[in-house]
């Protein structure tokens, strides 16, 4: 009789909590999640019921937290398509090297101008995750957290954010906790007396890192790999490696965050890396390049994100469209909070962006509200060149002159407005400086002006690159005169991939950004 009464009271309490949003912050998001689950709703409800049936208040809360924040998570299939979405036959893994894969890609692109890697399918977790899958992850995560000696100091909220999540990015779903923990059984036995979770985490990180090696071939395989796929292929890109390390660490109750910069500020591409955290969920790694912004992935929705702020009809740049990240730039470096006056702020435009120059174009990397024609950005990196932008439809458009924030936080506007009395000259010798590859640590030697190639010099003026001179094939004179001293320049080889770096001119010499 006592048992029956207890069960009834629990059921009534659960029902009252679910019915009263004031007593349960998850009630509203869970209701929306269940609607979006569609035919899979019964599986999500079954998962919640099983967690509730354990009688474990923390497991119940954790299950509700997962479902409340599940919207937006899923497996993304990204493939090469034409501009109208027609799939093109291309798999980088069919080639031995990035060079071979790029040659094949270039041949396809020649026949299909504008083709690119695009998301062709998204299997949302709400619509595809089973109750068995979710409960297995929940149960194993709690078992690890509650039994491993180094995990005892970890608060519940930190456990929930960094150990409980069952996925790393947009990879296929997988039950990776048991196999990863099995592979780490020896290091766990060797550290049974360890109580410092960060110290143990560093050991696990070092142990797991070799499980997946880096190869640039995966730059052209943008679909994230599952744990099983990485175990089979043993290769991936930085995102894959970070996910593998996070899987390994979570499986044994160590804490790992996944940080990333969407676009490097002084080189091409982007980067993701793992960060070993302490029991309070704090920590950061070193930077492998110049970063304007560093973000940390989260499973939870962030109410202050651009995705949460924008209206349904508003479009935003791709890399800022997620609500599952927080800004941790200030944990890595000294930052600035500049207020930028926009040269262009159309009526009704609520957000402005700043962009960095990467892979031949300006890439938005941060956002701010527009107030009376101005935008104040927060915690952006120094020693970097930026361009203010707005997003119109699906296009990113310039909204002001580029500017540099120097190491002291001083803003230098590059309006190319200096007159002849304040002009400068340039003897062009280099199109790209020495750059250390963030993924491999290898030094990429500078690219010089070659006598057997032709080059064009561009100046950023009035919102676009303007051609202001050329170096023809075989010319020995590489001098340009009467250039604006406050200009931003770009020297591009004819027929190149446009990977040359932008620069300013100081005392007649190129300063690259």
Give names to the regions the model predicted.
Residues 364-377, 467-480:
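Short, solvent-exposed S/T- and G/P-enriched segments that are highly enriched in secreted/extracellular
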Residues 350-368, 454-468:
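Short amphipathic beta-strand segments in non-cytosolic proteins
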Residues 2-11:
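Bacterial N-terminal signal peptides
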Residues 336-345, 425-433, 437-449:
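A short, amphipathic beta-strand motif
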Residues 393-422, 495-513:
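Structured interaction patches on ligand/partner-binding surfaces of diverse proteins
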Residues 374-394, 477-490, 494-496:
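Short Pro-Gly-centered beta-turn/loop motif in secreted/extracellular proteins
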Residues 35, 42-46, 54-233:
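Secondary-structure boundary elements
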Residues 29-34, 53, 186, 190-206, ...:
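Hydrophobic/aromatic-rich core segments of domains that either
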């Amino acid at each position: 009789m006592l048992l029956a009464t207890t069960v009834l009271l629990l059921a009534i309490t659960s029902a009252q909590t679910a019915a009263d949003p004031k007593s349960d912050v998850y009630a509203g998001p869970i209701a929306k999640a269940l609607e979006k689950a569609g035919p899979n709703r019964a599986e999500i409800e079954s998962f919640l019921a099983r967690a509730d049936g354990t009688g474990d208040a923390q497991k119940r809360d954790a299950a509700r937290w997962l479902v409340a924040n599940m919207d937006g998570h899923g497996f993304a299939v990204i493939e090469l398509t034409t501009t109208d979405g027609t799939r093109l036959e291309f798999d980088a893994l069919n080639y031995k090297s990035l060079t071979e894969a790029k040659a094949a890609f270039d041949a396809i692109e020649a026949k299909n101008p504008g083709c690119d890697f695009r998301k062709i399918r998204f299997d949302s977790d709400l619509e595809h995750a089973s109750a068995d899958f979710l409960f297995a992850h929940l149960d194993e995560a709690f078992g690890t957290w509650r039994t491993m000696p180094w995990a005892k100091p970890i608060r519940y909220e930190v456990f929930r954010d960094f150990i409980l999540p069952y996925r790393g990015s947009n990879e296929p779903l997988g039950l990776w906790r048991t196999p990863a923990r099995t592979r780490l059984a020896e290091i766990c036995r060797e550290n049974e007396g360890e109580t410092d979770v960060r110290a143990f985490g560093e050991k696990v990180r070092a142990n797991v890192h070799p499980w997946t090696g880096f190869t640039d071939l995966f730059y052209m395989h943008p679909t994230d790999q599952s744990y099983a796929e990485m175990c089979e292929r043993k290769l991936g890109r930085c995102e894959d490696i970070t996910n593998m390390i996070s899987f390994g660490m979570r499986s044994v109750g160590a804490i790992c965050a996944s940080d990333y910069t969407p676009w490097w500020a002084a080189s091409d591409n982007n980067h993701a890396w793992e960060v070993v955290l302490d029991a309070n969920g704090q920590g950061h790694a070193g930077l492998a390049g110049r970063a304007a912004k560093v973000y940390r992935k989260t499973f939870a929705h962030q109410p202050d994100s651009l995705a949460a702020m924008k209206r349904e009809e508003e479009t935003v740049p791709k890399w800022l469209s997620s609500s599952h990240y927080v800004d941790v730039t200030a944990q890595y470096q000294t930052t600035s909070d500049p207020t930028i006056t926009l040269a262009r702020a159309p009526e009704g435009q609520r957000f402005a962006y700043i962009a960095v120059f990467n892979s031949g174009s300006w890439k938005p990397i941060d956002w701010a509200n527009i107030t009376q024609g101005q935008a104040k950005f927060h915690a952006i990196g120094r020693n970097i060149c930026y361009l203010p932008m707005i997003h119109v439809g699906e296009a990113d458009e310039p909204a002001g002159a580029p500017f540099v924030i120097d190491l002291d936080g001083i803003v230098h506007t590059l309006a190319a407005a200096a007159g002849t009395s304040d002009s400068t000259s340039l003897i062009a010798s280099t199109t790209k400086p020495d750059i250390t590859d963030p993924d491999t640590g290898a030094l990429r030697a500078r690219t010089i002006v070659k006598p057997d190639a032709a080059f064009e010099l561009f100046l950023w003026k009035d919102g676009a690159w303007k051609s202001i001179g050329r170096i023809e094939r075989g010319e020995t004179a590489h001098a340009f005169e009467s250039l604006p001293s406050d200009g931003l320049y770009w020297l591009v080889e004819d027929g190149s991939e446009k990977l040359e770096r932008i620069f300013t001119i100081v005392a007649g010499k190129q300063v690259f950004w």
